[in-house]
Design a protein with these regions (language model features):
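Conserved AMP-binding/adenylate-forming
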Residues: 1-26, 170
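Conserved G/P- and acidic residue-centered "switch" motifs that form tight phosphate/ATP-binding loops
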Residues: 14, 133, 190
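Short hydrophobic alpha-helices that are characteristic scaffold elements of the AMP-binding
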Residues: 8-13, 34-35, 175, 187-188
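Conserved AMP-binding/adenylation subdomain of ANL enzymes
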Residues: 148-166, 174-215, 224-225, 229-230
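Conserved S/T- and glycine-rich ATP-binding loop of Class I adenylate-forming
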Residues: 10, 41, 124, 130-133, ...
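Conserved adenylate-forming
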Residues: 26, 34, 39, 46, ...
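Conserved pre-ATP/AMP-binding loop-to-beta segment of ANL
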Residues: 90-129, 136, 159-166
């Protein structure tokens, strides 16, 4: 959820979100940061060392904010996570020049000055990157109008949609499909998103049935995997 929060927060204060694949190599991350002139980076603790390795090469980068999966988990699930996946993550040095996500959120509660910036439809909102199939990957600058038009068009052509409907969002948020269709189209029109942190057909089906999601957006292989699951037989 930190990605969703920061995406809208950056837009609110007049910034541009630069969406990067978290599994990118250090060289690729350095390119993305330099190409965009990013002044702040938000990443998970498990990817901290990639950013630390390139930080000195990116003059514009002033702050690195570190979030953790455990930040948003309930206490019982957090304990289980720390005993399994969490223990595999390399510890960040205590004196590392970073801002922890919880600390960052607390800093916001003490801020008393004006921070909202009025933006026009033509103003840039986000940078997404091409696949690089014909050469080096390219940053694609999209405007507020691009994203809002997408949201309105998707909902306008879907007569079944009602405010409060749920989307099971599994597509990555550094991808236009995931960020534009699964997230912004729903939230901007009064819908809700159920975030899927890590995809497996079994976990996806479980969340779909648990939350009784009204919509899903995915690629053909996702639907093929769901159709092969016994738990989806006759599911409503």
């Amino acid at each position: 959820p930190q990605t969703v929060i920061m995406f809208y927060a950056v837009n609110l204060v007049g910034g541009i979100a630069n969406m990067v694949h978290p599994l990118s190599s250090e060289k690729e991350i350095e390119f993305y940061l330099k190409e965009s002139g990013s002044i702040c980076a938000l990443t998970l603790d498990q990817f901290y060392h990639k950013f630390e390795a390139v930080r000195q090469n990116v003059e514009s980068l002033n702050n690195v904010i570190i979030a953790s999966i455990k930040d948003e988990l309930s206490k019982p699930i957090k304990v289980g996570y720390m005993l399994t996946e969490g223990r595999k993550i390399q510890k960040i040095p205590a004196d590392a020049p970073i801002i922890r996500w919880k600390e960052f959120m607390q800093m916001g509660t003490r801020y008393r000055w004006k921070y909202k910036v009025h933006k026009e439809g033509k103003d840039p909102a986000v940078i997404l990157y091409s696949g690089g199939t014909t050469g080096i990957t390219k940053g694609i600058l999209l405007s507020n109008l691009n994203f809002n038009a997408l949201g309105q068009q998707i909902i306008a052509t879907n007569l079944m949609f009602r405010p409060g409907d749920r989307m099971l969002a599994v597509m990555p948020m550094f991808h236009g499909f995931g960020l534009g269709v699964s997230i912004h189209s729903m939230l901007s029109q009064g819908g809700r998103c159920v975030l899927v942190p890590r995809f497996t057909p079994q976990s996806y089906a479980k969340l779909l049935l648990k939350h009784r999601c009204n919509f899903i957006a995915g690629v053909p292989t996702l639907y093929e995997a769901l159709l092969r699951l016994p738990t989806m037989e006759g599911a409503d």
